[in-house]
Amino acid sequence: MTELLKTPIHPLYAKYGAKTIDFGGWDLPVQFAGIKAEHEAVRTDAGLFDVSHMGEILVEGPDSTSYLQYLLTNDIEKIKIGKAQYNIMCYETGGTVDDLVVYKKSETEYILVVNAANTAKDFEWMVKNIQGDVSVTNVSSEYGQLALQGPNAEKILAKLTDVDLSSISFFGFVEDADVAGVKTIISRSGYTGEDGFEIYMPSADAGKVFEAILAEGVAPIGLGARDTLRLEAVLALYGQELSKDITPLEAGLNFAVKLKKEADFIGKEALIKQKEAGLNRKLVGIELIERGIPRHDYPVFLNDEEIGIVTSGTQSPTLGTNIGLALIDTAYTELGQEVEVGIRNKKIKAKIVPTPFYKRAK
């Protein structure tokens, strides 16, 4: 059996009461104090996530921008230095290799932050499709990454840095930022639906920054709450809302797919065809009317006919209702449409509802 991978924060987990699980080959905390309490901490105060398992891939060289334009669906030329952009990497079929964030450090240097379980696959795909004078390097082992999320994130982080955090706009970042005596990159971004920051630092210093932030009275947060938070905010999870068989258009990520950008990109032709023909299925929000929790891969029915599948589901800690995302036949995606979810050989009533399920007050 392959030994599970560990983040640089791993030695500290036990000290804070972490219960760990195998997550895509990594030994990561599913919870600390408990999923519900952790979820609430992020929605009302702040919480700290160890996300050092995420992959980082460095792209540098004079042709970096044109290479990424070819590789990714969004418009890379629109990114200013010191800004980040959400992106999708597609196969020729339009299916998804991964979703990721691109950080522009200079005109010739970018860092791509990718899903942990996809790092090796993404890197291989990027090398295979290399164009022009660029180098692509997997630098994942060099970085630790923490996410401080919640309405009080800025106030807390301000105690540990001299950087004017209020000047960092959403998806903006600052390099060489001192946090608790460690040189970091601070990005105003996250995966929770709340305000917050993702902080990158050398792996060896990750534990120091982790403990310095927790010492400010912040709760450590595990993967369980990370999932309920991102689901309420309707943020896609690769392997569930996106996959090699699910295109970004089907997943409702049109804002990150620039079919009109001049540059050709991998999957562009297939996605244009899909858009012109009209989507056969799309991602919608569902809320259960009867008791039961929708889970990944549960079937969705209408009048005994299977019309789709649940991609993600949970009991929403914020709303107190049982919610899910489902990829279903476009003909049945009107708001208010009643459907049924197959849960343990029973069909449980649900309805299609607006998304996101949760949106923070600005």
Curated annotation (Swiss-Prot):
GO biological process: glycine decarboxylation via glycine cleavage system
GO MF terms held by the record: aminomethyltransferase activity; transaminase activity
EC number(s) from the headed UniProt entry: 2.1.2.10
Keywords linked to the UniProt accession: Aminotransferase, Transferase
Gene Ontology cellular-component annotations: cytosol; glycine cleavage complex
Pfam families: GCV_T, GCV_T_C
Catalytic activity as recorded in UniProt: N(6)-[(R)-S(8)-aminomethyldihydrolipoyl]-L-lysyl-[protein] + (6S)-5,6,7,8-tetrahydrofolate = N(6)-[(R)-dihydrolipoyl]-L-lysyl-[protein] + (6R)-5,10-methylene-5,6,7,8-tetrahydrofolate + NH4(+)
Record InterPro entries: GCS_T (IPR006223), GCS_T_bac (IPR022903), GCST_C (IPR013977), GCV_T_N (IPR006222), GcvT/YgfZ/DmdA (IPR028896), GcvT/YgfZ_C (IPR029043), TrmE/GcvT_dom1 (IPR027266)
Function: The glycine cleavage system catalyzes the degradation of glycine.
PANTHER family linked to this entry: AMINOMETHYLTRANSFERASE, AMINOMETHYLTRANSFERASE, MITOCHONDRIAL
Assembly mode: The glycine cleavage system is composed of four proteins: P, T, L and H.
Family the UniProt entry places it in: Belongs to the GcvT family.
Listed name of the protein: Aminomethyltransferase
Protein source organism: Listeria monocytogenes serotype 4a (strain HCC23)
Taxonomy of the source species: Bacteria, Bacillati, Bacillota, Bacilli, Bacillales
